[in-house]
Swiss-Prot record:
The organism of origin for this protein: Halothermothrix orenii (strain H 168 / OCM 544 / DSM 9562)
Active site, UniProt feature: E133
Cofactor note: Binds 1 Fe(2+) ion.
Entry protein name: Peptide deformylase
Family: Belongs to the polypeptide deformylase family.
GO MF entry, a single one: peptide deformylase activity
Record flagged with keyword Iron: yes
Catalytic activity: N-terminal N-formyl-L-methionyl-[peptide] + H2O = N-terminal L-methionyl-[peptide] + formate
Annotated residues for binding of Fe cation: C90, H132, H136
Alphabetized InterPro entries for the sequence: Peptide_deformylase, Peptide_deformylase_sf
UniProt entry keywords in alphabetical sequence: Hydrolase, Iron, Metal-binding, Protein biosynthesis
Coiled-coil intervals, chain numbering: none
Amino acid sequence: MPVLQIRKIGDPVLRSKAKPVTEITKKTLSLIDNMVETMYQAEGVGLAAPQVGVSKRIIVVDTGEGQGLIELINPEIIETEGKDIMEEGCLSVPGQTGKVIRASKVTVKGLNRGGKEVRIRAEGFLARAFQHEIDHLNGILFIDKVVRIGEEMI
């Protein structure tokens, strides 16, 4: 599987709303496989299709916390609870981190690679990863939500 080029801040695809996947084809599955390979190669915990230049609503996530690899097509957050603040970074914004407020718990629904609807209740780091990757599908980068860089308010 080829490792895909990760698009960096400034690339217009990162600021565009991704299009829903209307049919899961061999090409879709190949893209997912290549995204997974790219995420692991880059030592990331999540990757959205726009980050590899494809304007489709697909994310892959593996936080390394034991839940394993999660692949979602057309994911959406259907419920949130609580709030917390945590430092984030992004493969598309290399060398930058910042504190971002996000929901501490989320319920996400989407399709798995077989086209079956799944719902995942997540909290902590996994909830944060889902929110971060789904933001990418809406043209939003974590830097748009940063509340603190270092100790200075922005």
